[in-house]
């Protein structure tokens, strides 16, 4: 018992101690809570004082509203607020929003002053650089106007009251998203990033570069490209400014890019936003249709059911908020189920007794309207339901105007004082304020089902309703968006004269796009220009608003107007409205003869003069690397000096691949080379002897062999004569061709003209590589992107200038742009002085001798040329078409020619010259325009180089490793490299280039070979080049030189 008593005393002591500790903790908690309460009270008091200060500032600001319109007024004057430069703009905006209701405190940050919303006065040192224009983006060079962040911070921290800014402020909305660091300008940090649909301020006028100085709502300041923003309409801004008188308006509305441009954007953000429904980080783009509009009539507010009796009710309301100068409100209409029961004059009373109602059996909708000089207000903006079976939930929920990405939701509210919460697919989407009963969804997904729930939120508990009726607050509706269909067509299509006489410029206004680039749910990719149902131009850019169209295409279609369609992955839109082409633009220009220079335009003082008219289309292309470039064609048909350097940079150096496996020592490498050389020597010797005997027995071909022809000092190019071309043809006998004889060809790819092209390009390529001693690299710091030739499909490799000649198609194809050395490095003094003198001769100067060429392929520069100015400068032609050429080709490999009374450029690798001695036959051929289909062409001699001026050493090397560039090469243009196996004997020409590559030949294939994969064959081993196939087949096999013929016969 004693132990139990002691134990009880011990427990009682511990209990007392615990109670003491608990009491101390409770006192500590009480003290902390009191401290927190005092802190909150102090904060509340401070905020109240701040509110009073801001209210006074706002009142002073409103007094100057006539002089400065924050939302885009016209006349401006300096705002005389001495504390403006030092007062943070967020405080001012908070005060403005507080006066209007619930503002955008959280959306506005930073420490910029309100004075910073006024354009700064230009400083003496401000000298903006010229505009560097690019399509769709505004460019500007580095400017002294771009101040550092420290300078702007110093200005913000300045306490001086001196006014530094003047100008007017405008509210804008971003049309598209824009990241300055992805743009073309040198100082992207001076520009503001934009998000489509977000608001920003710009102040002052646009500068000469097309930029505004602006500020985002978070305080960021910088330059804004003018073509990326839309100004808010002045009339809607004026209406928005008047809403400050309404105590229940908790938002600021501005005009924006709502559906069809007729509604407004709401700056408030929803509580929850589904990322799949809206793609705007700043908040939803969905709008409340009835918020503000140009013709909104002020409506009565806060209708109240004062008393409900068995046969009557008493209702009251508050007067409308009428903007100054809007108009006069004369009276009120009280309606019951859209029937006017009484009319009350304004100012008498705002209560009404409505009798003759059967409250126990019927439900009535009571509404109050304002009657004004501009019409009556919307009855649903001041309405309530009374009577039997009234519930809190809205009724008649419906969805209209459903498209691929948008829909309009509407309902009938039980009480116009209720706000409503919108749920989309069980996710809270947005809140609609009181007196609103419509909602517009944007950025929906095409072909998707949605479930909408509208939850009514009463402003006060409707105690007059039974409990079960008070609990019914929700209404549902389901709908599905339309499948992604064709996009909307462009608007406001216009046609104007182009930058050149041979083109016109078609402009349009793109359809309204979502921030993700959708129109009607279709992913917009570009725009196409059509004439008589045929596409004549195309631009691949979703926000493009203009493009150039060749007049020759319109003349050939005899089109007098054009339409524009929006292109998308889901198809094309319908045609836009037809835009007529001015008749004066459709008249073909009269061709002018081209003046003839007195000396060779491309000849330099250090190069012996040769007869260019006897060189083929590809001859002397390597000389263009060492001479100044011929001037580009101009529409005045006059030669001009070369222009400044281009904008392209040289391609990166070729990367030397590294062999896989254990490195091979020098001794082993030489042993491998000796073994491989001896292994193939005997078979190579026998094959070579067989080829030699075969060629010796055919004497007529020995004289035309490639090496013999090149080494012959008397060799001289002469095109096939017109007599040879037309001998036995109908054109040579009579002017008309009949008899349905045709070429025995499958297509341009398989024709003899194509074979001629292929042979000559192969020979020219090998000659250039041999002569240059390997691959030539760009040099110097200035580079020019020379015009790239249209490429016939019969060529199959990359030449030394990087041009690609793809195989495997039926006609010329588009090649990728390349960079080549600039001719400006060589200077103007390398050109003949007569070249510049002749450039300024009058049209009466001596004409260049005209030559006759025949087209080897069909060629449409609009779709096949890789050059950006192809539509304006290059000529289209068909296979077999006769082309009149003036002078020699320029450094880019283009002739200046004439077809269909139009002058332009012609790629030399797609035409062949016909030597004409008979002027009468030449004129007749020009009148004919095309070679007759039954013309037998007996012989065409193609371009040949007059001789090799340099002797290039050849060496034999053996491959130490297997190499397949498609698998092992780190370079992009793997087709320029050879595939080989260990032990293959490769002939290399010249020395190693600075990238570590040889130019070599294996099995009739020529290309680049990595030097670290090869070992030179010892001199004491006799090696004959083997034509035995390698273990790997080359991608683009070339015909053996032994099979080449120096003449080509067309079989009728």
Swiss-Prot record:
BP terms from Gene Ontology: neuromuscular synaptic transmission
Transmembrane portions of the chain: none
Stretches with biased composition (Basic residues): 1040-1052
Entry-linked PROSITE patterns: FN3 (PS50853), SH3 (PS50002)
Domain SH3: 167-234, 848-916, 952-1019
Sequence ranges assigned to domain Fibronectin type-III in this UniProt record: 297-390, 393-475, 489-590
Subcellular location as annotated: Cell membrane; Synapse
Highest rank taxon of the organism: Eukaryota
Modified residues (Phosphoserine): 704, 712, 832, 839
Residue list for modification Phosphothreonine: 841
Keywords: Cell membrane, Membrane, Phosphoprotein, Repeat, SH3 domain, Synapse
Keyword Repeat appears in the UniProt entry: yes
Function: Plays a role in the synaptic transmission as bifunctional linker that interacts simultaneously with RIMS1, RIMS2, CACNA1D and CACNA1B.
Subunit structure: Interacts with RIMS1, RIMS2, CACNA1D and CACNA1B, and potentially with other Ca(2+) channel alpha-1 isoforms.
Swiss-Prot/TrEMBL domain comment: The SH3 domains mediate binding to a proline-rich motif in RIMS1, RIMS2, CACNA1D and CACNA1B.
Family: Belongs to the RIMBP family.
Name of the protein in question: RIMS-binding protein 2
Originating species: Homo sapiens (Human)
Gene that produces this protein: RIMBP2
């Amino acid at each position: 018992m004693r132990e139990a008593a002691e134990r009880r005393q011990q427990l009682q002591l511990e209990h007392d101690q615990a109670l003491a500790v608990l009491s101390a903790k409770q006192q500590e908690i009480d003290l902390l809570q009191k401290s927190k309460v005092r802190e909150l009270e102090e904060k509340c008091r401070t905020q109240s004082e701040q509110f009073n200060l801001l209210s006074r500032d706002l009142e002073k600001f409103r007094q100057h509203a006539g002089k400065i319109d924050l939302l885009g007024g016209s006349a401006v004057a300096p705002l005389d607020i001495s504390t403006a430069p030092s007062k943070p703009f967020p405080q001012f905006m908070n005060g403005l929003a507080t006066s209007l209701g619930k503002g955008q405190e959280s959306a506005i940050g930073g420490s910029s002053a309100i004075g910073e919303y006024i354009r700064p006065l230009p400083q003496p040192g401000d000298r903006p650089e010229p505009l560097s224009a690019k399509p769709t983006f505004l460019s500007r060079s580095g400017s002294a106007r771009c101040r550092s962040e420290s300078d702007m911070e110093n200005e913000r921290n300045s306490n001086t009251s001196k006014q530094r800014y003047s100008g007017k402020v405008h509210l804008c909305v971003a049309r598209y998203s824009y990241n300055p660091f992805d743009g073309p300008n040198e100082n992207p940090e001076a520009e503001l990033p934009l998000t489509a649909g977000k608001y920003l301020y710009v102040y002052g006028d646009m500068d000469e570069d097309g930029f505004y100085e602006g500020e985002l709502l978070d305080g960021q300041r910088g330059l804004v490209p003018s073509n990326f923003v839309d100004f808010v309409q002045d009339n809607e801004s004026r209406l928005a400014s008047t809403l400050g008188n309404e105590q229940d308006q908790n938002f600021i509305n501005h005009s924006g890019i709502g559906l069809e441009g007729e509604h407004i954007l709401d700056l408030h953000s929803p509580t929850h936003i589904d990322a799949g429904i809206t793609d705007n980080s700043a908040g939803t783009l969905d709008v409340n249709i009835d918020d503000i509009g140009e013709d909104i009539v002020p409506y009565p507010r806060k209708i109240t059911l004062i008393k409900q009796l068995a046969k009557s009710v008493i209702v009251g309301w508050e007067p409308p908020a009428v903007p100054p100068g809007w108009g006069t409100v004369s009276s009120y209409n009280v309606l019951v189920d859209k029937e006017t029961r009484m009319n009350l004059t304004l100012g008498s009373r705002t209560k009404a007794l409505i009798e003759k109602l059967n409250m126990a059996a019927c439900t009535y909708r009571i509404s109050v309207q304002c009657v004004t000089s501009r019409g009556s207000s919307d009855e649903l903006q001041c309405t309530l339901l009374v009577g039997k079976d009234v519930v809190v939930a809205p009724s008649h929920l419906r969805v209209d105007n459903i498209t691929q990405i948008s829909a309009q939701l509407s309902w009938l509210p039980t009480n116009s004082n209720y706000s409503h919460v919108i749920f989309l697919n069980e996710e809270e989407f947005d809140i609609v304020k009181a007196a609103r009963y419509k909602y517009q969804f944007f950025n929906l997904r095409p072909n998707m089902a949605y479930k909408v729930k509208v939850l009514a939120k009463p402003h006060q508990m409707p105690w007059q309703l039974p409990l079960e009726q008070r609990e019914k607050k929700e209404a549902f509706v389901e709908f599905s968006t339309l499948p992604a269909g064709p996009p909307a067509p462009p608007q406001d299509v216009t046609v104007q004269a182009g930058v050149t006489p041979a083109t016109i410029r078609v402009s349009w206004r793109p359809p309204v796009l979502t921030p993700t680039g959708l129109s009607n749910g279709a992913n917009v990719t570009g725009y196409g220009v059509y004439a008589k149902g045929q596409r004549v131009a195309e631009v691949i850019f979703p926000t493009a608003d203009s493009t150039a169209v060749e007049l020759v295409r319109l003349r050939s279609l005899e089109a007098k107007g054009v339409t524009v369609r929006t292109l998308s992955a889901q198809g094309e839109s319908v045609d836009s409205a037809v835009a007529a082409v001015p008749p004066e633009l459709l008249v073909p220009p009269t061709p002018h003869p081209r003046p003839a220079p007195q000396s060779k335009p491309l000849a330099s003082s250090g190069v012996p003069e040769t007869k260019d008219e006897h060189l083929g289309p590809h001859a002397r292309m390597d000389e263009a690397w060492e001479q100044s470039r011929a001037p580009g064609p101009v529409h005045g048909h006059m030669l001009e000096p070369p222009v400044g350097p281009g904008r392209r940079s040289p391609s990166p150096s070729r990367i030397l691949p590294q062999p896989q496996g254990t490195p091979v020592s020098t001794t082993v490498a030489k042993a491998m080379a000796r073994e491989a050389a001896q292994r193939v020597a005997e078979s190579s010797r026998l094959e070579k002897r067989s080829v030699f005997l075969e060629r010796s027995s055919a004497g007529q071909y020995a004289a035309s062999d490639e090496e013999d022809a090149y080494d012959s000092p008397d060799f001289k190019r002469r095109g096939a004569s017109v007599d040879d071309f037309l001998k036995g043809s109908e054109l040579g006998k009579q002017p008309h061709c009949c008899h349905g004889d045709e070429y025995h060809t499958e297509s341009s790819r398989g024709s003899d003209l194509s074979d001629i092209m292929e042979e000559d390009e192969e020979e020219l390529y090998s000659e250039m590589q041999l002569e240059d001693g390997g691959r030539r690299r760009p040099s110097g710091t200035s580079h020019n992107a020379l015009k790239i030739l249209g490429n016939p499909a019969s060529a199959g490799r990359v030449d030394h200038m990087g041009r690609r000649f793809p195989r495997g198609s039926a006609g010329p194809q588009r090649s990728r742009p390349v960079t080549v050395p600039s001719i400006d490095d060589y200077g103007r003094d390398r050109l003949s002085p007569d070249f510049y003198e002749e450039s300024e001769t009058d049209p009466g100067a001596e004409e260049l001798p005209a030559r006759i060429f025949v087209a080897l392929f069909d060629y449409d520069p609009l779709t096949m040329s890789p050059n950006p100015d192809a539509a304006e400068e290059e000529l289209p032609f068909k296979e077999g078409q006769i082309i009149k050429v003036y002078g020699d080709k320029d450094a880019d490999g283009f002739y200046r020619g004439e077809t269909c009374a139009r002058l332009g450029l012609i790629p030399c690798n797609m035409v062949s010259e016909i030597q004409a001695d008979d002027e009468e036959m030449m004129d007749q051929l020009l009148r004919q325009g095309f070679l007759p289909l039954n013309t037998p062409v007996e012989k065409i001699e193609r371009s040949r180089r007059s001789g090799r001026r340099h002797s290039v050493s050849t060496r034999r090397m053996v491959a130490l490793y297997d190499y397949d560039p498609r698998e092992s090469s780190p370079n992009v243009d793997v087709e320029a490299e050879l595939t080989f196996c260990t032990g293959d004997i490769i002939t290399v020409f010249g020395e190693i280039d600075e990238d570590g590559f040889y130019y070599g030949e294996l099995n009739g294939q020529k290309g680049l070979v990595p030097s670290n994969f090869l070992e030179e064959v010892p001199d004491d081993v006799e090696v004959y080049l083997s034509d035995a196939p390698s273990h790997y087949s080359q991608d683009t096999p070339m015909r053996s030189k032994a099979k080449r013929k120096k003449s080509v016969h067309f079989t009728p």
